[in-house]
Amino acid sequence: MKTIFALSSGRPPAGIAVIRISGSAAADTACLLTRKKIPEARRAVLRNLYDPDSGEQLDQSLLLWLPAPKTVTGEDLLELHVHGGRAVIDAVLKTLEKLPDLRPAEAGEFTRRAFENGVISLHEAEGLGDLLTAETASQRRAALMMSGGALGRQISAWQDRLLALSGQIEASFDFAEDIEEDETESRQHLAVMKDKIAALIAEHRQFENRPTMERLRDGLRVVLAGRPNAGKSTLINALTGQDIAITAPIAGTTRDVIEVSFALKGIPMRFSDTAGLHESDDLIEKAGIERAQRAIEEADILLWLGQAEEAPKTDGEVLVLYPQIDLPERHPIPEKIDIAVSAVTGEGIDRLQEKLVEIGKKILPKEDEVTLNRRQRQLVKEAADSLALALDAEDMLIIAEAIRQACRCYDRLTGKAGVENMLDNLFSRFCIGK
């Protein structure tokens, strides 16, 4: 397997750039570049870097030599901390390309080697991928929990309990001829075992029923809807603090769904400004209204700017808003209103934002709970379904097989088996150098 290299720090220019080299040729590379022996392990040293062919000095670098297996990839690892100018980085990378047994790393290849060498598990790699794409505080916390091994610890706890049950079953097979157990004792033993399995299933179902990491990544779907010129565009600008939608006193300014992602107190949200709902013969406007209706159907929260009895049906929560309360003609405020707001004066905006955050915390994953992605949730479900077969069984062989099937799901969760077809997709999400 060839040794790989890549720029592992951010884009230049920068104060310092870190170039990472991983593989069996890392030590020889250090000697070639510095014209000196390999330095002491895990101790940063200052070395001049040279082009082995021309002898030209490339830079003065802080060099860190990390021998396998205690490295981030499980392989010999060399880090070059060079000056972060583009010319310096380009010169070092071009020199590395010319060296034997070296090639540029592909996206996520350092992390993939860490997984293949047993440094991290599959779910930890997935958590790291989510951490790299996290844009809000809640996404960051969930990804850190996963990459820190929270799911692995839960799986290990489940496995230990199943292995204990499996050991009891094996013992009953081994000593069946030597120990006579009356029917009452046998049924009691089976009932206790099934109670333990039922408790495990209940724990699996709790994980299965939680919102997924994809749900957290996509954010809360908040849709603003109402009749034309109801103040939707002005309100979305006020809610996000951005100039998202065109506002004008002319009805029908918005003809399509305008979306913007925004975080309120760390809660990711995707706001959608929609076309005003009314009868129209204009083909373009009708298309916009149809898209608005689809957005309403998919909304987690519908902010309805209109009369409560006219609010569309949706599976999500509906907040009836009464906008433009800065205008005298908008008073008195009618009943059946959740929040009265003014995008001009800001009245009611803070209250509306607090309400959105409150609902978001109920819908999105909780910060103190392990958040699974769809693949992980499906495997937890399959493990629970396998264990459920044991609840109706009277034969210990069937129960033992149900436990084995559940354990195979755990192996797929951690990446010990049956995951080759999804690895390329996972690691392609990583940047080069990670």
Curated annotation (Swiss-Prot):
Top-level taxon: Bacteria
EC number of the protein: 3.6.-.-
Cofactor info, note text: Binds 1 potassium ion per subunit.
Cofactor requirements of the protein: K(+)
Residue ranges of domain TrmE-type G in the record: 219-361
Entry-linked PROSITE patterns: G_TRME
Amino acids binding Mg(2+): S233, T254
Gene Ontology molecular function terms on file: GTP binding; GTPase activity; metal ion binding
Residues annotated for GTP binding in this entry: 229-234, 248-254, 273-276
Annotated compartments: Cytoplasm
GO cellular component, one term: cytoplasm
Chain positions recorded as (6S)-5-formyl-5,6,7,8-tetrahydrofolate binding sites: R20, E79, V119, K434
Subunit structure: Homodimer. Heterotetramer of two MnmE and two MnmG subunits.
Function, as annotated: Exhibits a very high intrinsic GTPase hydrolysis rate. Involved in the addition of a carboxymethylaminomethyl (cmnm) group at the wobble position (U34) of certain tRNAs, forming tRNA-cmnm(5)s(2)U34.
Protein name per the record: tRNA modification GTPase MnmE
Lineage, uppermost ranks: Bacteria, Pseudomonadati, Pseudomonadota, Alphaproteobacteria, Sphingomonadales
Gene name of the record: mnmE
